[in-house]
């Protein structure tokens, strides 16, 4: 499923495509910079069921991906650990430096090796 519609002029909305008929329905309305929330009233029961199934399948696929890519967990947990230890004032700058550190891939690789030896 891919979002491909554009919002009507003068309105900022997120759109998603559903089912065989490619019906486009508004799911979330935004105002300014924030999302107001889902508007289930715009979906018929069949679309709500499709959305629920899509969410479940997406969560399952994401979980499978994370289980087969342990490095993602190591990257995120390492980032949070360093962030909480250093408590930087500029989190965006800190994140940019953390994830572009040329030593990061070898650190993650060493952690993966260490975890494999432990199991």
Curated annotation (Swiss-Prot):
Transmembrane segments: none annotated. Residues 70-104 form the RIIa domain. Abundant in tissues rich in highly ciliated cells, such as testis, trachea and olfactory epithelium. It comes from the Eukaryota. This is RIIa domain-containing protein 1. It comes from Mus musculus.
């Amino acid at each position: 499923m891919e979002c491909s519609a554009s919002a009507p002029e003068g309105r900022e909305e997120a759109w998603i495509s559903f089912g065989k008929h490619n019906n486009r329905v508004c799911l979330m309305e935004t105002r300014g910079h924030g999302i107001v929330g889902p508007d289930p009233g715009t979906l018929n029961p069949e679309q709500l069921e499709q959305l629920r199934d899509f969410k479940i399948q997406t969560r399952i696929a994401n979980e499978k991906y994370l289980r087969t890519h342990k490095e993602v967990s190591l990257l995120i947990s390492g980032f949070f650990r360093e962030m909480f230890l250093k408590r930087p004032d500029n989190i965006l700058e800190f994140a940019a430096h953390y994830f572009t550190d040329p030593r990061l891939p070898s650190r993650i690789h060493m952690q993966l090796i260490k975890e494999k030896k432990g199991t």
